[in-house]
From Swiss-Prot:
Its EC number is 3.5.1.102. InterPro entries: Creatininase-like_sf, Creatininase/forma_Hydrolase, FAPy_deformylase. The lineage of its organism: Archaea, Methanobacteriati, Methanobacteriota, Methanomada group, Methanococci. This is 2-amino-5-formylamino-6-ribosylaminopyrimidin-4(3H)-one 5'-monophosphate deformylase. HAMAP family: FAPy_deform. The gene is arfB. It is an enzyme of class 3 (hydrolase). Its cofactor is Fe(2+); Zn(2+). Catalyzes the hydrolysis of the formamide of 2-amino-5-formylamino-6-ribosylamino-4(3H)-pyrimidinone 5'-monophosphate (FAPy) to form 2,5-diamino-6-ribosylamino-4(3H)-pyrimidinone 5'-phosphate (APy). Fe cation 2 binds at H35, D44. One of its GO terms (molecular function) is 2-amino-5-formylamino-6-(5-phosphoribosylamino)pyrimidin-4(3H)-one formate-lyase activity. Requires one Fe(2+) ion for activity. Requires an additional second metal ion that could be Fe(2+) or Zn(2+).
Protein backbone atom coordinates (compact mmCIF):
# COMPACT_ATOMS: atom_id res chain seq x y z
CA UNK A 1 0.00 0.00 0.00
CA UNK A 2 1.50 3.33 -1.10
CA UNK A 3 -0.61 5.40 1.27
CA UNK A 4 -2.21 4.71 4.61
CA UNK A 5 -5.44 6.51 5.39
CA UNK A 6 -6.01 7.62 8.98
CA UNK A 7 -9.60 7.85 10.23
CA UNK A 8 -9.37 11.52 11.17
CA UNK A 9 -13.09 11.76 11.95
CA UNK A 10 -13.03 9.05 14.63
CA UNK A 11 -13.41 9.75 18.33
CA UNK A 12 -14.40 12.86 20.23
CA UNK A 13 -13.58 16.02 18.26
CA UNK A 14 -14.58 19.58 19.05
CA UNK A 15 -17.35 20.65 16.66
CA UNK A 16 -16.73 17.29 14.96
CA UNK A 17 -13.90 19.01 13.06
CA UNK A 18 -11.07 16.68 12.04
CA UNK A 19 -8.79 19.70 11.45
CA UNK A 20 -8.27 19.67 15.22
CA UNK A 21 -5.65 16.96 14.58
CA UNK A 22 -3.47 19.74 13.17
CA UNK A 23 -3.46 21.51 16.55
CA UNK A 24 -1.02 20.74 19.36
CA UNK A 25 -1.11 21.90 22.99
CA UNK A 26 2.12 22.47 24.92
CA UNK A 27 2.47 23.07 28.68
CA UNK A 28 4.99 25.64 29.92
CA UNK A 29 5.80 26.49 33.53
CA UNK A 30 8.72 25.97 35.88
CA UNK A 31 10.18 22.73 37.22
CA UNK A 32 12.61 24.14 39.80
CA UNK A 33 10.98 26.74 42.01
CA UNK A 34 10.18 26.82 45.73
CA UNK A 35 6.47 26.99 46.60
CA UNK A 36 6.44 26.93 50.39
CA UNK A 37 5.94 23.64 52.24
CA UNK A 38 2.53 22.44 50.98
CA UNK A 39 3.21 22.64 47.23
CA UNK A 40 5.99 20.99 45.20
CA UNK A 41 8.81 22.76 43.38
CA UNK A 42 7.23 21.97 40.01
CA UNK A 43 3.79 23.37 40.84
CA UNK A 44 3.62 25.68 37.82
CA UNK A 45 4.39 23.04 35.22
CA UNK A 46 2.05 20.52 36.87
CA UNK A 47 -0.82 23.03 36.72
CA UNK A 48 0.00 23.91 33.10
CA UNK A 49 0.21 20.21 32.19
CA UNK A 50 -3.13 19.46 33.85
CA UNK A 51 -4.82 22.26 31.93
CA UNK A 52 -3.12 21.43 28.63
CA UNK A 53 -3.96 17.73 28.85
CA UNK A 54 -7.60 18.46 29.66
CA UNK A 55 -7.82 20.87 26.73
CA UNK A 56 -6.47 18.13 24.47
CA UNK A 57 -8.84 15.50 25.90
CA UNK A 58 -11.84 17.80 25.56
CA UNK A 59 -11.17 19.01 22.02
CA UNK A 60 -9.28 16.20 20.31
CA UNK A 61 -6.15 18.34 19.86
CA UNK A 62 -2.79 16.70 20.47
CA UNK A 63 -1.08 17.01 23.87
CA UNK A 64 2.58 17.54 23.00
CA UNK A 65 4.05 17.51 26.50
CA UNK A 66 6.01 20.20 28.31
CA UNK A 67 8.72 22.79 27.83
CA UNK A 68 11.61 21.80 30.10
CA UNK A 69 13.15 25.25 30.43
CA UNK A 70 11.78 28.31 32.24
CA UNK A 71 13.00 31.85 32.77
CA UNK A 72 12.57 34.45 35.49
CA UNK A 73 13.28 38.11 36.15
CA UNK A 74 16.73 38.63 37.65
CA UNK A 75 15.33 40.25 40.78
CA UNK A 76 13.14 37.25 41.69
CA UNK A 77 15.24 34.64 43.44
CA UNK A 78 13.19 31.61 44.43
CA UNK A 79 14.35 28.93 42.01
CA UNK A 80 16.68 27.79 39.25
CA UNK A 81 15.91 29.17 35.81
CA UNK A 82 17.18 29.47 32.25
CA UNK A 83 17.48 32.32 29.77
CA UNK A 84 14.71 33.50 27.47
CA UNK A 85 16.85 32.34 24.56
CA UNK A 86 16.95 28.81 26.01
CA UNK A 87 13.15 28.65 26.03
CA UNK A 88 12.79 29.96 22.49
CA UNK A 89 15.36 27.47 21.25
CA UNK A 90 13.52 24.58 22.93
CA UNK A 91 10.15 25.75 21.61
CA UNK A 92 11.56 25.88 18.10
CA UNK A 93 12.77 22.29 18.43
CA UNK A 94 9.40 21.10 19.78
CA UNK A 95 7.42 22.84 17.05
CA UNK A 96 9.62 21.62 14.22
CA UNK A 97 9.52 18.07 15.62
CA UNK A 98 5.74 17.90 15.85
CA UNK A 99 5.22 19.61 12.52
CA UNK A 100 6.55 16.34 11.09
CA UNK A 101 3.32 14.59 12.12
CA UNK A 102 1.03 17.17 10.56
CA UNK A 103 0.68 19.65 13.44
CA UNK A 104 0.81 23.24 12.21
CA UNK A 105 -0.97 25.18 14.96
CA UNK A 106 0.47 25.29 18.46
CA UNK A 107 -1.14 26.54 21.67
CA UNK A 108 1.29 27.08 24.55
CA UNK A 109 -0.34 27.14 27.98
CA UNK A 110 1.92 28.98 30.42
CA UNK A 111 1.43 29.00 34.19
CA UNK A 112 4.65 30.73 35.27
CA UNK A 113 4.84 34.51 35.52
CA UNK A 114 8.55 34.58 34.81
CA UNK A 115 7.87 33.29 31.29
CA UNK A 116 5.82 36.37 30.41
CA UNK A 117 8.43 37.74 28.01
CA UNK A 118 8.09 34.64 25.82
CA UNK A 119 4.82 36.06 24.49
CA UNK A 120 6.70 39.09 23.16
CA UNK A 121 8.85 36.80 21.01
CA UNK A 122 6.17 34.44 19.66
CA UNK A 123 5.63 36.25 16.35
CA UNK A 124 9.37 36.41 15.79
CA UNK A 125 9.70 32.69 16.55
CA UNK A 126 6.79 31.90 14.25
CA UNK A 127 8.40 33.76 11.34
CA UNK A 128 11.75 32.09 11.98
CA UNK A 129 10.19 28.63 11.82
CA UNK A 130 8.14 29.51 8.74
CA UNK A 131 11.26 30.67 6.94
CA UNK A 132 13.46 27.77 8.01
CA UNK A 133 11.08 24.80 7.81
CA UNK A 134 12.74 21.82 6.16
CA UNK A 135 11.36 18.41 5.42
CA UNK A 136 13.59 15.69 6.75
CA UNK A 137 14.01 12.49 4.84
CA UNK A 138 16.94 11.11 2.94
CA UNK A 139 16.44 7.37 3.20
CA UNK A 140 13.74 5.49 1.34
CA UNK A 141 12.03 4.65 4.64
CA UNK A 142 11.93 8.30 5.73
CA UNK A 143 10.58 9.45 2.37
CA UNK A 144 7.86 6.81 2.53
CA UNK A 145 6.87 8.09 5.99
CA UNK A 146 6.63 11.67 4.72
CA UNK A 147 4.49 10.52 1.82
CA UNK A 148 1.99 8.94 4.23
CA UNK A 149 1.88 12.06 6.41
CA UNK A 150 1.28 14.28 3.38
CA UNK A 151 -1.53 12.00 2.23
CA UNK A 152 -3.41 12.52 5.52
CA UNK A 153 -2.39 16.10 6.33
CA UNK A 154 -2.66 18.16 3.16
CA UNK A 155 -1.09 21.25 4.74
CA UNK A 156 2.09 19.41 5.75
CA UNK A 157 5.06 21.52 4.73
CA UNK A 158 2.93 24.64 4.13
CA UNK A 159 4.93 27.06 6.26
CA UNK A 160 2.27 29.77 6.00
CA UNK A 161 -0.04 27.54 8.04
CA UNK A 162 2.34 27.33 11.01
CA UNK A 163 0.73 29.39 13.76
CA UNK A 164 1.77 29.77 17.41
CA UNK A 165 -0.26 31.26 20.25
CA UNK A 166 0.40 31.50 23.96
CA UNK A 167 -2.15 31.70 26.77
CA UNK A 168 -0.78 32.65 30.18
CA UNK A 169 -2.37 32.27 33.60
CA UNK A 170 -0.85 33.91 36.64
CA UNK A 171 -1.60 33.68 40.34
CA UNK A 172 0.04 34.98 43.52
CA UNK A 173 2.99 32.72 44.19
CA UNK A 174 2.18 29.71 46.43
CA UNK A 175 -0.86 31.53 47.82
CA UNK A 176 -4.59 30.70 48.00
CA UNK A 177 -5.23 30.20 44.27
CA UNK A 178 -2.29 27.90 43.65
CA UNK A 179 -2.97 26.03 46.89
CA UNK A 180 -6.62 25.51 45.94
CA UNK A 181 -5.71 24.34 42.45
CA UNK A 182 -3.04 22.13 43.97
CA UNK A 183 -5.57 20.48 46.26
CA UNK A 184 -7.91 19.90 43.34
CA UNK A 185 -5.30 18.22 41.13
CA UNK A 186 -3.64 16.29 43.95
CA UNK A 187 -0.28 18.01 44.47
CA UNK A 188 -1.11 19.81 47.74
CA UNK A 189 -0.05 18.22 51.05
CA UNK A 190 -2.43 19.18 53.84
CA UNK A 191 -0.11 17.81 56.54
CA UNK A 192 2.46 20.48 55.65
CA UNK A 193 0.06 23.41 55.49
CA UNK A 194 0.57 24.47 59.13
CA UNK A 195 4.10 25.59 58.24
CA UNK A 196 3.10 27.11 54.89
CA UNK A 197 3.45 30.77 55.86
CA UNK A 198 5.49 33.67 54.44
CA UNK A 199 7.28 33.90 57.78
CA UNK A 200 8.67 30.40 57.22
CA UNK A 201 8.97 30.54 53.44
CA UNK A 202 9.63 34.00 52.02
CA UNK A 203 8.68 33.06 48.46
CA UNK A 204 4.99 32.75 49.45
CA UNK A 205 3.46 35.87 47.91
CA UNK A 206 7.09 37.04 47.49
CA UNK A 207 6.75 38.53 50.99
CA UNK A 208 10.32 37.69 51.93
CA UNK A 209 11.93 38.66 48.62
CA UNK A 210 12.93 42.32 49.17
CA UNK A 211 14.66 42.72 45.81
CA UNK A 212 11.54 41.57 43.97
CA UNK A 213 9.30 43.87 46.00
CA UNK A 214 11.60 46.82 45.42
CA UNK A 215 11.78 46.30 41.65
CA UNK A 216 8.14 45.46 40.97
CA UNK A 217 5.29 47.48 42.46
CA UNK A 218 2.73 44.81 41.58
CA UNK A 219 4.68 42.17 43.49
CA UNK A 220 4.96 44.52 46.46
CA UNK A 221 1.21 45.18 46.39
CA UNK A 222 0.44 41.45 46.35
CA UNK A 223 2.99 40.81 49.09
CA UNK A 224 1.33 43.37 51.36
CA UNK A 225 -2.00 41.62 50.87
CA UNK A 226 -0.46 38.22 51.65
CA UNK A 227 1.07 39.68 54.81
CA UNK A 228 -2.35 40.75 56.06
CA UNK A 229 -4.59 37.91 54.78
CA UNK A 230 -3.63 34.28 55.53
CA UNK A 231 -3.85 31.77 52.68
CA UNK A 232 -7.06 29.76 52.33
CA UNK A 233 -7.35 26.36 50.64
CA UNK A 234 -10.69 25.74 48.93
CA UNK A 235 -11.01 22.76 46.60
CA UNK A 236 -14.21 24.06 45.00
CA UNK A 237 -12.46 27.34 44.23
CA UNK A 238 -9.60 25.36 42.71
CA UNK A 239 -12.04 23.47 40.49
CA UNK A 240 -13.58 26.75 39.33
CA UNK A 241 -10.16 28.16 38.44
CA UNK A 242 -9.21 25.03 36.49
CA UNK A 243 -12.50 25.04 34.61
CA UNK A 244 -11.95 28.70 33.72
CA UNK A 245 -8.42 28.02 32.46
CA UNK A 246 -9.52 25.05 30.38
CA UNK A 247 -12.49 26.88 28.87
CA UNK A 248 -10.46 29.97 28.00
CA UNK A 249 -7.82 27.78 26.36
CA UNK A 250 -10.46 25.91 24.35
CA UNK A 251 -11.49 29.23 22.80
CA UNK A 252 -7.99 29.42 21.31
CA UNK A 253 -8.55 25.99 19.76
CA UNK A 254 -11.78 27.28 18.20
CA UNK A 255 -9.92 30.32 16.86
CA UNK A 256 -7.36 28.03 15.26
CA UNK A 257 -10.12 26.02 13.58
CA UNK A 258 -11.57 29.20 12.08
CA UNK A 259 -8.30 30.02 10.30
CA UNK A 260 -8.36 29.35 6.57
Amino acid sequence: MDNFELRLNSGKLIDNDSKVHEIGVIAMGSYLENHGSALPIDTDIKIASYVALNVALTTGAKFLGTVCTATEYDYIKHGIHNSLEDILEELEEIIIKYSKIGVNKFLIINCHGGNSDVSKKIEQLQEKIRNNFKEYGTTEKELEYIKKIKYNFKEYGNTEKINIKIKSFGYIHAYSEELSIGKCIGIYDETKFNKHTPENYGEIGMVGLPEARLNNKYIDKEAKMVESIPAVVNEQYGEELIKKMVNESIEYIREFLMLK
